[in-house]
């Protein structure tokens, strides 16, 4: 039996094509994935991301616990509402999950992936046993992402909270006032566009979705969410990183806080050894302007370089009009490579793993 978000009936009524996504019955599109993609790049689109797992960490040991649990350092969060992107690693340095952690007034809030929920909660709870903390999953909360160059203005029109005007990127704030209990609005996203991710009580989500649709925000499915994040060069768990892939290989080295040197975090010893030895593979972007679409699991080779790489995510880019991909390749690969597709060899350009930000080509 697939799980349903509080917006399930609305998705069905609005023509959403529902599919199994990590055990959840979610809309992949509402008719045209490409139109939904363009709506986010050029205007404002909204996504139901209530399948994400929200976990609050409270107690006197919360800070020390998260400084041990996460590769990034929550001590970087100086003000309530500030957010940090991080990997949660195993002892071998592999990525159990990637997540966002917020500093809250009464502790911390984690937002983790839905497909890894059971694994994540088991790991968090097992590691928490040594600390004075309480781990609280918040299944009663829903989450709606509103993304695009017009997204913030649309949300401001509805909510009218002056505090949102001052919100900086990667910062969130709890709303106050009648009707806004347990609302938390963060200037974060997974599209390469500006916007908000709104965490709110499940019973309030339907009205917010309907109100956003009424003022012209386009409902978008998971298909557009994937092409948008891929254009932005953002990792997807299970593709660009997993339990056997370290953040150093997955273009996430910037999320590892090495200082202060005395901070011990899970996976630090393994990452230190890997860093000293030098990584064997790296994550790159691929661009193919010919006919055809690059797809995950296709092999990548480079003339004169030993070893074989693999595409981790690939798609047709609606913004650029040709195919792009992320690939894990040997470090010796430079600016040109070949993707082997059946009996064809497609010549591709290698770039840094980011293609589009704020609607503009960045390579």
Curated annotation (Swiss-Prot):
Classify the source by domain of life: Bacteria
One of the protein's GO biological processes: glycine decarboxylation via glycine cleavage system
Q: Extract one GO cellular component term from the record.
A: glycine cleavage complex
Listed GO MF terms? aminomethyltransferase activity; transaminase activity
Q: Which reaction does it catalyse?
A: N(6)-[(R)-S(8)-aminomethyldihydrolipoyl]-L-lysyl-[protein] + (6S)-5,6,7,8-tetrahydrofolate = N(6)-[(R)-dihydrolipoyl]-L-lysyl-[protein] + (6R)-5,10-methylene-5,6,7,8-tetrahydrofolate + NH4(+)
Q: Name one Pfam family in it.
A: GCV_T
Q: InterPro entries, from UniProt?
A: GCS_T, GCS_T_bac, GCST_C, GCV_T_N, GcvT/YgfZ/DmdA, GcvT/YgfZ_C, TrmE/GcvT_dom1
Q: List the disulfide bonds.
A: none
Q: Which UniProt keywords apply?
A: Aminotransferase, Transferase
Enzyme Commission number: 2.1.2.10
Membrane-spanning segments? none
Record NCBIfam families: gcvT, PRK00389.1
| Membership in a protein family | Belongs to the GcvT family.
Q: What does this protein do?
A: The glycine cleavage system catalyzes the degradation of glycine.
Q: How does it assemble?
A: The glycine cleavage system is composed of four proteins: P, T, L and H.
What is the name listed in the Swiss-Prot or TrEMBL entry for this protein? Aminomethyltransferase
- Source organism: Teredinibacter turnerae (strain ATCC 39867 / T7901)
What does the organism's lineage look like at the top?
A: Bacteria, Pseudomonadati, Pseudomonadota, Gammaproteobacteria, Cellvibrionales
